[in-house]
Amino acid sequence: MQREYHRWWSKDLNRDMELLCFGHAGTKVLVFPTSQGRFFEYEDNGMVGNLADRIDSGQLQLYCVDSVDGESWYNKHAHPYWRVQRHMQYERYIVDDVLALMWKKNQTPRLIATGCSFGAYQAANFGFRHPDAVTGIVTMGGAFDMKDFVDGWYSEDFYFNNPPDYLANCTDPWKYNHIRTVLATGEWDMCWEKNERFATILRNKGIRHELYVWGDRSFHDWPWWKPMARMYLE
């Protein structure tokens, strides 16, 4: 399997950022880590190996990015305004640097944003904010409402980074018609209800999506996200 490590200075974040790329061709997959996770966690938790046959055959090419969650949403020492601003800087880094690298290496127009747990929020928010850049959103065990991270504070910038809010008021849902959106959760997943609520918002706006609730005592952890990735990342 082709594996590449990249590190460079991000002007948007004013710090070095790292990522891992797996594969040589195929649908590009932008992988966001879990809460305060690192760029290597997808590999360390067996998700890359889980998809090895598709990566080796040129079906998928993974780009596993780092997070700055500890500087943004999880930074309780900062005012919520600055948490949101740091998140927006992170998004600009993804657009300016990561998407540019992806396009340089692979010109296929197919791009799936994916993530587990907190990474599911990142994937969904990025995909719905940038429908021109993605063709798929695959979330596993996701929670999508960020109000718990801002201590009752609210602003326009927060609104436009909180998918349940801006999608509930969406007046042009047609712009998402080309995106295959998958919400995967489990009957023992602590985020099951959050997926149901988010799916209701999408359904009410006519935004195409698929909600899958796995049985067999499936809950919020890697052993269940692995088969979900096998099922929905293609």
Task: Give the residues covered by each predicted segment.
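Non-catalytic cap/lid and distal C-terminal segments of serine-dependent acyl enzymes
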Residues: 1-234
